[in-house]
Amino acid sequence: MIEIRFHGRGGQGAVTAAEILAKAAFEDGKYSQAFPFFGVERRGAPVMAFTRINDEPIRRRYQVYNPDYVVVLDEGLVDVVDVFSGLKEDGVVLLNTAGTFTSENAKIHTIDATGIALENLGRPIVNTVMLGAFAGVTGLVSIDSLIKIIKETFPGKIGDKNAEAARIAYEKMKHSG
């Protein structure tokens, strides 16, 4: 079973990202689940969300404590929350940052999701960009399923723009090695 933990701030779309990822995995023929964890529920407060993906039915019904992957939508959270907490020894972190970031604790992939979102969406909402990057890094979900679910979640022009932003991030990460 693959377990993913998303870190974001209220209003950034971490919960929606976890749900879209689970639906895309289901679209690819896998079992999946997604759920949020809220502390103080207010815009800007740290939020976690979780996705599990498996080839067999998932019986677990609790938050992810030892993720295989951590997706950080806001690099400022690295200084506020222990995003590496419980990360498996061979775990991977995907971090939204325009800069570089290294850690002795994890393999880290970075992408300027905010820049891609601003260029393609006109807003710094990075959830779909990070999902495209996640698909490119991991191959856990197909980009076609991800784009289909993004367009179902956000109909019309907004969905098209989010799908394109996800595809750009996917291509960037898929070819980054």
From Swiss-Prot:
InterPro entries: Oxidoreductase_gamma_subunit, PorC_KorC, Pyruvate_synthase_PorC, Pyrv/ketoisovalerate_OxRed_cat, Pyrv_flavodox_OxRed_cen. It catalyses: 2 oxidized [2Fe-2S]-[ferredoxin] + pyruvate + CoA = 2 reduced [2Fe-2S]-[ferredoxin] + acetyl-CoA + CO2 + H(+). Its EC number is 1.2.7.1. The keyword Heme does not apply. It holds the Pfam family POR. The keyword Nucleotide-binding does not apply. Optimum temperature is 80 degrees Celsius. GO terms for molecular function: pyruvate synthase activity. Optimum pH is 10.0. Keywords: Oxidoreductase. Heterotetramer of one alpha, one beta, one delta and one gamma chain. This is Pyruvate synthase subunit PorC. It comes from Methanothermobacter marburgensis (strain ATCC BAA-927 / DSM 2133 / JCM 14651 / NBRC 100331 / OCM 82 / Marburg). The lineage of its organism: Archaea, Methanobacteriati, Methanobacteriota, Methanomada group, Methanobacteria.
